[in-house]
Regions:
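Structural recognition of the beta-strand scaffold that forms the well-ordered cores
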Residues: 154-157, 232-236, 286-290, 345-349, ...
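Long, acidic (Asp/Glu-rich), low-complexity accessory segments flanking structured domains
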Residues: 2-229, 242-280, 285, 395-478
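Active-site beta-loop-alpha junctions enriched in small/polar residues
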Residues: 160, 239, 291-295, 350-352, ...
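A Trp-anchored, charged/polar loop motif used as the substrate-binding/catalytic surface
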Residues: 214-220, 267-276, 317-339, 363-381, ...
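Substrate-binding cleft and catalytic face of glycoside hydrolase catalytic domains
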Residues: 235-243
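Aromatic-lined glycan-binding groove of carbohydrate-active enzymes
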Residues: 341-419
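Intrinsically disordered, low-complexity acidic segments that are enriched in bulky aromatics
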Residues: 258-322
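N-terminal cap/leader regions of alpha/beta-hydrolase-fold enzymes
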Residues: 216, 226-229, 235, 300, ...
Length: 478
């Protein structure tokens, strides 16, 4: 009988919570014992009442003491595999749920028929982490404790990959006025557009939002929510709009996060949100790493003086607890010494990093090449750098066939970036938990980076921070 498969994943770190996944005729109930596992369900027409009825409901429910805290569903046609309607039909609708004691995040990928290596099974994940993650640094290194006398570099920090690309708002302001002349300019700056040379300009112009969505939108949460989840490291690529974009849009003339030349969050807004969080959480820190990897030359970059001025202006917004900013020298200083000075916004520019990412390895739909990169990293490799970065997300959009297929079949929840999110996390995050501290023992800060930041990623960084800040850390065998 016709059926459509759904792979389901969950992560739970708050006691008393369970996640139920169901389709007609079948139910899966996950607890924390099922973290980092993949399970499968089938919307099978044989379980759908009615001779010519093919549509069945896939639903997940978050339960606490048998009470339903939240739920979401999609109605799936078992004959075509398509999602006909539901509450998870567009990525922009996947808003986190904040309860009295937990933060729930989730995602759903609408799969096609398994073309170009992509999965033919819909993908759904749900994660539940503690609201206490908002104050985790104060918990693992309380003021006055022995842990807080250790260098800041002992922290392991979770990072939202391309955090400034969490919305299409800036892009939509440009695309609303884009024409074929705009497209001609964009072809010069966005090499992946050559993959669509077979399309007439008017059709490519129509598809442009889908191209950008598949290339660049790697987050879906606002910065305050990322911070509440426990993210503490943010790479930012500030630059002004391309001249042609300035002419087209009514966006303010200021510095934006840039993905090549695709604009995201404004830098001043980003800094203001960081300081607002630090002002309300006096034991917490944030690291901002300013870089310009891949930013096209036509996008004007801020000078160091301008960066300093924007940092000063942002820090001046603090009302309750002083917030000062510092540089890479803060990494080697005791945590409590930084707290006493109020130096809790650490900003580095083009710092040296020891990074797992390479273009070749990460152009993948599976975890194996990424795990091989992890396996090759050593303590010796860390020594000459400021930061060690373990990237969990694939850049499958750099595979021509994958990007083209995702764009041409685009719906609101079909970005190729979402197709691998949950499956990769079930392999990369457990590897990091088991092996990172054994393999990487230099006195350097470690960063765990991921797309669509979630509780499983942030909890990983918190647990490793707790281990690295243990008084007997240097004597342990991992």
């Amino acid at each position: 009988m016709p059926s459509k498969g759904i792979a389901v994943y969950s992560y739970i770190s708050v006691p008393g919570y369970q996640i139920e996944f169901s389709v007609p005729g079948s139910t899966i109930l996950n607890t924390s014992d099922d973290n980092f596992t993949a399970k499968g369900l089938e919307v099978d027409s044989s379980n759908i009442p009615g001779r010519l009825h093919f549509t069945g409901r896939f639903e997940w429910r978050v339960l606490q003491s048998d009470n339903v805290i939240h739920s979401a569903y999609n109605d799936i046609n078992s004959l075509t595999g398509k999602v006909e309607e539901g509450t998870m039909t567009a990525t922009v609708d996947f808003l986190p749920i904040v309860t009295e004691d937990a933060i729930i995040t989730y995602g759903f990928y609408v799969a096609g028929h398994g073309k170009v290596g992509l999965t033919n099974r819909h993908q759904c994940y749900v994660t539940i982490c503690s609201k206490d993650n908002a104050t985790w640094m104060g918990s693992v290194a309380p003021s006055g404790s022995l842990q807080a006398q250790l260098p800041f570099s002992r922290f392991v920090l979770a990072a939202p990959h391309d955090n400034g690309m969490n919305s299409m708002t800036s892009c939509e302001a440009i695309f609303a006025a884009a024409d074929e002349d705009t497209l001609a300019d964009l072809r010069k700056f966005l090499p992946p557009l050559r993959f669509f040379d077979h399309l007439p300009n008017h059709l490519l112009l129509h598809k442009l939002p889908h191209v950008v969505y598949g290339l660049a939108i790697t987050q879906k949460k606002e910065v305050p929510l990322m911070l509440a989840l426990g993210a503490r490291y943010f790479e930012f690529r500030p630059a002004k709009l391309l001249p042609i974009f300035r002419k087209l849009s009514k966006l303010p003339d200021k510095f934006y996060f840039q993905h090549s030349c695709i604009p995201g969050l404004a830098f001043d807004d980003f800094l203001a949100q960081q300081v607002e969080f630090l002002d309300a959480h006096p034991d917490e820190f944030v690291v901002v790493h300013i870089r310009w990897d891949g930013v096209v030359k036509g996008c004007e970059r801020p000078t160091q003086e301008q960066i300093d001025e924007m940092l000063d202006e942002a820090c001046s917004l603090a009302q309750q607890n002083p917030v000062e900013w510092g540089g890479r020298e803060c990494f080697s200083e005791p945590i409590d010494a930084l707290r006493r000075r109020g130096q809790r916004l650490i900003c580095v520019v083009e710092a040296e990093k020891y990074d797992s990412w390479t273009a070749k390895a990460y152009a993948t739909l599976t975890a194996e090449p990424i795990l091989e990169q992890f396996e090759a990293m050593t303590t010796e490799g860390q020594e000459a750098t400021d930061l060690t970065i373990l990237q969990c997300q694939a850049t499958s959009q750099s595979i021509k066939e994958v990007l083209v297929y995702s764009v041409m079949s685009a719906r609101a929840a079909t970005s190729c970036l979402t197709s691998t999110k949950a499956l990769l996390d079930t392999q990369t995050l457990p590897w990091i938990r088991r092996n990172a501290l054994q393999r990487l023992q230099a006195e350097r800060m470690i960063v765990v980076m991921n797309d669509f930041i979630d509780g499983a990623t942030t909890d990983t960084s918190i647990e490793l921070s707790r281990q690295r800040l243990a008084v007997d850390y240097g004597q342990k065998e991992y």
